[in-house]
């Protein structure tokens, strides 16, 4: 395989995630929509909320890798080619970004414009 093809990446991702692929895709789309809505509503990012959410994002990336290997038939020893390694790295960063954006959005809807590090 000398060239990168998006179809291959898509097919391998569907095989690795199995039945969780489409529900995960729907949750990702809803999370992105909620995050963008908050950005427009608040006219920017709240730095304190983003900092706390990104710390949880580190755990979200690790959880994404755990879920990836627990729901698929693959294990860490099955990582052989470059496409497998690319998907593992993408899964970590996807879990990091998704959990960061999800927590940022949840906190933004529950406590709008409030942050512990802001002085009132």
Curated annotation (Swiss-Prot):
Subcellular location(s) of the protein: Cell membrane
Main location: membrane
Transmembrane segments: 20-39, 52-71, 86-108
GO CC terms of this entry: plasma membrane
Keywords, alphabetical: Cell membrane, Membrane, Transmembrane, Transmembrane helix
Its membrane topology: Multi-pass membrane protein
One Pfam short name: DUF5368
InterPro entries per UniProt: DUF5368
UniProt keyword Mitochondrion present: no
Name this polypeptide is given: Uncharacterized protein PM1478
